[in-house]
Amino acid sequence: MRPIFVFSAMASAVILSGCSPVISDTLLSPAERQERSIEHARAAVKAQKSGNLANLRSELDAAVVGRGGDARARADIGQLMLDFGRPDMAIQVIEPAYKLPALKITPALWNVAFSAATKLDDKALAVKAKTNGLASAEAINLALDRPAAGDRDKAVLILNSLDAIDFLQSKAVDRPADAIKLAEKLAGYAKQSPLALSRCALAYAELSGSPKDLDKAITLAEDALLFAREQGSIAAVVVRLKDTLGWVHLLRGKPQDLDAARLFLREVVDENPDSATSRYHLARTWEALGLLDRAITEYQRVLFLRPDDSETKQRLKVLKTLGGESSGPVK
């Protein structure tokens, strides 16, 4: 499972590429903008339930504007609506972006559209989302062959490339070879972008798994963390990169890797205790180390944060049949 962190589009542009700042000092921090957007999204759900259409529209607009007002913002809020169990409202949020040019639409938006269409059994929208997502990913692939017009354009292209890799790897498309190629291309395009290098590391580790590519993945993940610290990246980015490095160590699976994974992932969970993904990675580490009681406790914490996680439920069930028990209360 991949760590999931959401940033405003403009803030991410500075974070990802080491570019000169383009954000006004008067804007909220990325964390504050994220929290404010979540509040508006929750208010929109309440307005929809009560039938207050005026409030529904204003809260959705505020949530989108709070993330930057672009297609990426709509994808972020659409994903929140999916997380809230409202695929119908996810569609409401993302529809206004459908007519934008391919390069202006992050593939994450089409990922949201495909997920919502699947939940709503809308086959036509599912086909449209997959087709348009592939077109967007190809446009991004071609754009990586050209020099960026400026720092902001380069940073946005990096962000969209990350989303394109996720889209190619998703259940909607399932093109692992294409995802690896795009990740390699992005790492070459943005040689000092921590998240670009980290994403390439994930592609090698999750999609290839060959010993040679796993070694490459470790090197890339280590470089990503080093660059982030040198560039003074915000804490949320550093935590994400440590999570990736720990996860990649676990996937390589040598004895020294398991110790490294344990150290990194325990640190990540201490710094970000509400991350279900990081807790899942730590649970997998305890499982690999044979510490089943600890693994069970951590899987239970994952389900507390993410109740519908079917993979975690299955792993927990298997461990309990092996005789493991929870090592403490779930908090």
What are these regions (language model features)?
Residues 30-33, 37, 71-72, 104-107, ...:
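Helix-start (N-cap) detector for alpha-helical repeat units in TPR-like alpha-solenoids
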Residues 45, 79, 115, 163-168, ...:
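Residue-level recognition of tetratricopeptide repeat
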Residues 49, 83-84, 115, 119, ...:
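Register position in tetratricopeptide repeats
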Residues 202-209, 214, 222-270, 274:
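Alpha-helical adaptor scaffolds
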Residues 68, 102-104, 138, 191, ...:
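Short coil turns that delineate tetratricopeptide repeat
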Residues 76, 112, 160-161, 199, ...:
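Canonical tetratricopeptide repeat
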Residues 19-72, 76, 83-84, 92, ...:
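N-terminal leader/linker segments that initiate helical-solenoid repeat arrays
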